[in-house]
């Protein structure tokens, strides 16, 4: 494994530790992640029409994703607590699944990236959709949660290339 591929959360003795970012330069960091909730067409219609028993599925899931991004350091042991400057969660209908596509964009000016915050936002938004619609469709699937892009920081930019 080259230095560029070294696991940063593992020290020389193989123990997990929180990375010291104190000497790193502050840069603007942005990460975008996505995930999907596949469901029956009838369940998608129920959500679209605002008829889910628990209320506004999309609005609630959007808020849950935003809240989750802000709590990432409390959920993932070695993540730094961050002062996020922007979290946006967009949930759109994808009739091809059928289901919902969840995208989260997280931004800050700081010393460490926000990939985990974007992925956490997507994960919790998807789980919230499942929770709020499970009475209608227990067979829903949460799929393809992944980082789409990140910018800023020493490791440079990343953009997922689709084949």
Curated annotation (Swiss-Prot):
<feature type="active site">
    <location>
        <position position="131"/>
    </location>
</feature>
<keyword id="KW-0501">Molybdenum cofactor biosynthesis</keyword>
<protein>
    <recommendedName>
        <fullName>Cyclic pyranopterin monophosphate synthase</fullName>
        <ecNumber>4.6.1.17</ecNumber>
    </recommendedName>
</protein>
<comment type="function">
    <text>Catalyzes the conversion of (8S)-3',8-cyclo-7,8-dihydroguanosine 5'-triphosphate to cyclic pyranopterin monophosphate (cPMP).</text>
</comment>
<comment type="subunit">
    <text>Homohexamer; trimer of dimers.</text>
</comment>
<feature type="binding site">
    <location>
        <begin position="78"/>
        <end position="80"/>
    </location>
    <ligand>
        <name>substrate</name>
    </ligand>
</feature>
<dbReference type="InterPro" id="IPR023045">
    <property type="entry name" value="MoaC"/>
</dbReference>
<dbReference type="GO" id="GO:0006777">
    <property type="term" value="P:Mo-molybdopterin cofactor biosynthetic process"/>
</dbReference>
<dbReference type="InterPro" id="IPR036522">
    <property type="entry name" value="MoaC_sf"/>
</dbReference>
<feature type="binding site">
    <location>
        <begin position="116"/>
        <end position="117"/>
    </location>
    <ligand>
        <name>substrate</name>
    </ligand>
</feature>
<keyword id="KW-0456">Lyase</keyword>
<comment type="pathway">
    <text>Cofactor biosynthesis; molybdopterin biosynthesis.</text>
</comment>
<dbReference type="GO" id="GO:0061799">
    <property type="term" value="F:cyclic pyranopterin monophosphate synthase activity"/>
</dbReference>
<comment type="similarity">
    <text>Belongs to the MoaC family.</text>
</comment>
<dbReference type="InterPro" id="IPR050105">
    <property type="entry name" value="MoCo_biosynth_MoaA/MoaC"/>
</dbReference>
<dbReference type="InterPro" id="IPR002820">
    <property type="entry name" value="Mopterin_CF_biosynth-C_dom"/>
</dbReference>
<dbReference type="Pfam" id="PF01967">
    <property type="entry name" value="MoaC"/>
</dbReference>
<dbReference type="GO" id="GO:0061798">
    <property type="term" value="F:GTP 3',8'-cyclase activity"/>
</dbReference>
<dbReference type="InterPro" id="IPR047594">
    <property type="entry name" value="MoaC_bact/euk"/>
</dbReference>
């Amino acid at each position: 494994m080259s230095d560029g591929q070294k696991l940063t959360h593992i020290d020389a003795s193989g123990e997990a530790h929180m990375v010291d970012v104190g000497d790193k330069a502050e840069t603007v960091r942005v990460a975008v992640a996505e995930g999907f909730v596949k469901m029956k067409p009838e369940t998608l219609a129920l959500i679209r029409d605002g008829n889910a028993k628990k209320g506004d599925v999309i609005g609630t899931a959007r808020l849950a994703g935003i809240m989750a991004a802000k709590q990432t350091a409390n959920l993932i042991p070695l993540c730094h607590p961050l002062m996020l400057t922007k979290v946006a969660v967009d949930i759109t209908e994808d009739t091809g699944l059928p289901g919902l596509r969840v995208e989260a964009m997280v931004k800050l000016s700081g010393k460490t990236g926000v990939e985990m915050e974007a992925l956490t936002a997507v994960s919790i938004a998807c789980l919230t959709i499942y929770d709020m619609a499970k009475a209608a469709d227990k067979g829903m699937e949460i799929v393809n949660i992944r980082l789409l892009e990140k910018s800023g920081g020493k490791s440079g930019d990343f953009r997922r290339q689709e084949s």
